[in-house]
A protein has these predicted regions:
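N-terminal beta1-alpha1 cap of cysteine-dependent amidohydrolase-like domains
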Residues: 1-95, 100-155, 163-177, 181-197, ...
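An anion-binding catalytic pocket shared by soluble metabolic enzymes
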Residues: 160
């Protein structure tokens, strides 16, 4: 019998967070869909000084809940996952931090920053023009992208809980190398990215895991777990 799929859930768990309530349900539904056993482990960010649990996992999810208690640990983890080709999913804060990691360590924007935690440097992640706390909206996907393939659709209605996103002043410059912007809202603002040279590296500002609260599967969670199965 195959061993369970080991899943690292990186973030500072808060039982009142809607996304954190949804994640175990989304994982269970994805495991049932794929007919596999899973072994999820929440890893608080203060424990990221040691990446052993990350290395031993089959896939990593940087979950919502930023700013994290240990930002530097999160960025070290992101760089290792990106360079080590570990299947990765990021949602909400996980998306924001993945963008900053890429800007700093691939594009060389060493002063790339998040407006929620700094007032210096290039504010790659900046306040949204309208808050998306407990809001929903239509998201469109690039044809042929991993996100579109996972959804088997070019659009979806998705839920959010955030006040920050990609600064439009930097969105065009972020693309190139191996980062593709593959999801947008109806105004053309960035809502999802993926890396083309990675087995599975997808991050979205929306929280696809919330589908589980409506007794629906999250296509991205299923695709992330399938990528881990394919690589195992």
């Amino acid at each position: 019998m195959p061993l369970p799929l080991r899943l690292a859930l990186v973030g500072d768990y808060r039982p009142e967070a809607v996304a954190h309530q949804a994640i175990p349900l989304a994982l269970s539904r994805a495991a049932a869909h794929l007919a596999i056993d899973i072994e999820p482990e929440w890893i608080p960010t203060p424990e990221l000084g040691d990446l052993t649990a990350i290395r031993q996992s089959h896939a990593v999810w940087l979950v919502p809940g930023s700013p994290y208690k240990n930002d530097e640990g999160v960025f070290s983890m992101l760089r290792w996952v990106r360079e080590g080709e570990k299947p990765f999913l990021g949602s909400c804060g996980g998306f924001q931090y993945a963008v900053i990691d890429y800007a700093r360590h691939v594009l060389g924007w060493h002063d790339a920053n998040h407006a929620e935690t700094s007032d210096e440097g290039r504010m790659v992640i900046a306040p949204l023009s309208c808050s998306l706390v407990e809001q929903r909206g239509e998201v469109t996907f690039e044809p042929g992208s991993r996100i579109a393939t996972a959804y088997d659709s070019l659009s979806s209605d998705e839920g959010y809980h955030c006040n920050f996103g990609v600064n439009p002043d930097f969105s065009a410059a972020l693309e190139g190398n191996n980062l593709r912007i593959t999801a947008w809202d109806l105004n053309g603002d960035v809502r999802g990215i993926e890396l083309t040279d990675h087995p599975f590296y997808v991050a979205t500002l929306f929280q696809s895991e919330r589908a589980a609260l409506q007794d629906k599967d999250s296509p991205l969670v299923i695709a992330w777990m399938q990528a881990a199965l394919d690589q195992r």
